[in-house]
């Protein structure tokens, strides 16, 4: 079961800084993994022993089998990385208190403008409206509190400068309304606007300007880590759909903002309209940054890991990075100053099937 051990399977054989130590012997056997190997072996044998109309069909079947086997192995590796990276989120939630906040951010799928009544021809060739969601989570008196910051961005590219300015806006708002917050932990997916040297290195300046120290920044594996943003996005889309069904049109960013804030808005969500201008920046080169998934910041520099808590990591002092980052200047106007909303109570425990029947 060596491929079940995160310290062993996720270690880098070439770089000792990203190599974990494991004292296990890895002499156990996983029955499900062995069953999978047996099924794949029997399937390959059946293909080789089967009769085909021509040699080309047999080679095509074997090629399809090899591609499917490779996809299964990649999916298994993905599951291991997903679980290991999710441990970063769990550890952060366990250490949250009044002075710490976890921020999960993601670009929602662009909203396609909608009219209350529109023809079939008007449905096509639409230009979507960009909107960004940041969910703030903190713990107060042993209860988790959540709040969503929604930025409707008009005429702006979803790039690193835009993300940096939105991050600073959220942290500055939190610091102004909750001065007790001292540090923040960020979590996002591997989109290029997040997983860029400009965005990551700008965290130092964001911390100084906002007054909240960005202590840690983690990237989730695909489809594993931004569910909080997706849940708020689904609720808001339904809210906008109801607004359109009442006879309103949502064609511009201003109308989209009006839809999100209609009838008191969405509980626990705050909406801001962002006017984006052209950006200017100096790209900072960081070789191999696409393979780094965990970043821990300090006053001296940043320590990075390829997999969460695998190896001692590699430290980069701030002096190693040359160039200056120029953020995108946006016109921000925050509406709906709602307080934090408490998370709903946990669902009731599932009953045993025998007790139901």
Model segments located where?
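Extended mixed-charge, aromatic/glycine-enriched low-complexity segments
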Residues: 1-357
């Amino acid at each position: 079961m060596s491929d079940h051990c995160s310290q062993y399977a996720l270690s880098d054989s070439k770089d000792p800084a990203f190599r974990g130590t494991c004292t296990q012997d890895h002499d156990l056997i996983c029955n499900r993994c062995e069953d999978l190997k047996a099924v794949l072996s029997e399937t390959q044998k059946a293909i080789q022993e089967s009769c085909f109309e021509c040699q080309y069909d047999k080679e095509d079947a074997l090629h399809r089998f090899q591609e499917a086997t490779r996809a299964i192995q990649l999916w298994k590796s993905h599951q291991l990385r997903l679980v290991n990276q999710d441990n970063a989120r769990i550890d952060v939630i366990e250490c949250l208190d009044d002075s710490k906040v976890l921020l999960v951010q993601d670009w929602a799928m662009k909203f396609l403008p909608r009219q209350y009544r529109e023809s079939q021809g008007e449905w096509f060739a639409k230009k979507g409206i960009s909107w960004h969601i940041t969910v703030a989570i903190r713990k107060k008196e042993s209860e988790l509190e959540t709040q969503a910051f929604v930025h409707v961005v008009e005429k702006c590219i979803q790039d690193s400068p835009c993300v940096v300015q939105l991050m600073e806006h959220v942290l500055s708002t939190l610091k102004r309304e909750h001065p007790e917050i001292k540090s923040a932990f960020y979590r996002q997916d591997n989109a290029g606007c997040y997983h860029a040297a400009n965005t990551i290195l700008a965290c130092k300046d964001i911390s100084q300007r906002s007054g909240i120290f960005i202590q840690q920044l983690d990237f989730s594996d695909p489809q594993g880590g931004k569910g909080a943003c997706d849940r708020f996005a689904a609720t808001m889309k339904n809210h906008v759909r109801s607004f359109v069904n009442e006879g309103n049109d949502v064609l511009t960013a201003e109308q989209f903002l009006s839809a999100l804030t209609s009838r008191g808005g969405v509980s626990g969500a705050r909406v801001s309209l962002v006017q984006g201008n052209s950006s200017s920046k100096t790209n900072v080169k960081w070789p191999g940054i696409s393979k780094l998934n965990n970043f821990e910041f300090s006053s001296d520099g940043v320590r990075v890991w390829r997999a969460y808590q695998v190896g001692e990591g590699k430290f980069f002092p701030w002096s190693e990075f040359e160039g200056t980052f120029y953020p995108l200047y946006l016109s921000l106007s925050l509406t709906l100053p709602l307080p934090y909303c408490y998370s709903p109570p946990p669902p009731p425990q599932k009953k045993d099937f025998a007790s139901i029947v």
